[in-house]
Amino acid sequence: MASYGMNDVKNGMKILVNAEPAVITDTEYVKPGKGQAFTRVKYRLIKSGRVQEVTMKSTDTLEAADVVDTDMQYLYSDGEYWHFMQQETFEQVQADKNGMGGAEKWLKGEEQCVVTLWNGVPIGVQPPNFVELKITETDPGLRGDTSGGGKPATLETGAVVRVPLFVNQDEVIKVDTRSGEYVSRVK
């Protein structure tokens, strides 16, 4: 397995920490006035999302993780697993609830996603930045009611987003999956 020296470490690199994949989010080289120089490495564990920091001497190394980001098409969910297919090879993988990481509420079928694979197993799914979903349930907007600035709406996938008062049930809206916010109505 490959390893990185402290001079080679950069943001975005995938490493193994205690046999768990992580991505480096920040590195800082520190040279104190007295003593040996060291590097502070901040990383985020891919599976749990926890951020941790470690201080490494310049002679230490970090083990590279065999993590691959692959473009895949979402096919369907059987209730327990979400199935994805690679477009070129038609190879299919299935992700469980932990591997989905909350992305399941934005997927209805045939969306292109970035699936993070570790040893051939999905450990993270990134849905498209914007999705168009139909509103299945929302309160009717009352004329003159502008106090709240919005109302909750349930989408066809079960996700709940805050929408403006003029948006009605059975309309299709565009949602930003990174923030979970309403963007616009779809004509």
Curated annotation (Swiss-Prot):
PTM entry text: May be beta-lysylated on the epsilon-amino group of Lys-34 by the combined action of EpmA and EpmB, and then hydroxylated on the C5 position of the same residue by EpmC (if this protein is present). Lysylation is critical for the stimulatory effect of EF-P on peptide-bond formation. The lysylation moiety may extend toward the peptidyltransferase center and stabilize the terminal 3-CCA end of the tRNA. Hydroxylation of the C5 position on Lys-34 may allow additional potential stabilizing hydrogen-bond interactions with the P-tRNA.
Superkingdom to which the source organism belongs: Bacteria
Pathway: Protein biosynthesis; polypeptide chain elongation
Subcellular locations according to the entry: Cytoplasm
GO terms of biological process kind: peptide biosynthetic process
Record-linked Gene3D superfamilies: 2.30.30.30, Nucleic acid-binding proteins
GO cellular component: cytoplasm
Keyword terms: Cytoplasm, Elongation factor, Hydroxylation, Protein biosynthesis
Family under the similarity heading: Belongs to the elongation factor P family.
Main function: Involved in peptide bond synthesis. Alleviates ribosome stalling that occurs when 3 or more consecutive Pro residues or the sequence PPG is present in a protein, possibly by augmenting the peptidyl transferase activity of the ribosome. Modification of Lys-34 is required for alleviation.
Protein name per UniProt: Elongation factor P
